[in-house]
Amino acid sequence: MENISPRLESELRRVAKGPSANEKPGGIGTVRFTVRCPIGTADVLAKAKSVLEAVDNATLAGWPSNEKAAPQLPQWFIDRCAPPITQEEAERQLAWRKSLPLEEQNRLRNETDWSLDNWLYWMEPSNRQWFWWDAKVLEDYDHIALAIEVEAWPFPWGALRWLFRAAGASAVEAEE
């Protein structure tokens, strides 16, 4: 596995200050998202940043191989996550979902709360395929313009969606 530390350090800087004027994204570039927030757009953005900072700092300290460096996540995020389920229950839910029409499967994928363990799995360095690039709360709007640096397209971004939904967003949509 590549050394992810420089990438996380850059991500932490961009979370705090945005990209520098001459900075170019790595991978294949950026993918843009619209994050819809019914209320408290600035608060949603601040909450999402706080969780990502906790994960990045824990990873730089040796997580997940060093369990003592586990992310110190905000309690609101932990409380917002779904309780863990057994393997048997997960298999039963998966079989049920696969029996549904595709449109309903997609709706459930977008609306179902994630467990903390599932979310952390996708935030482990070996599973991360997206990194924060930039985000702006648009004036007089109820949404955030978000740019994410990606390695390839398509890429799994359910953990990104859950990060913002847990923070209070009503929807996260990739721009076409």
Identify the residue ranges that each predicted region occupies:
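Structured alpha/beta or helical-core interaction and ligand-binding surfaces enriched in interleaved
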Residues: E2-R161, R165-A169, E173-E176
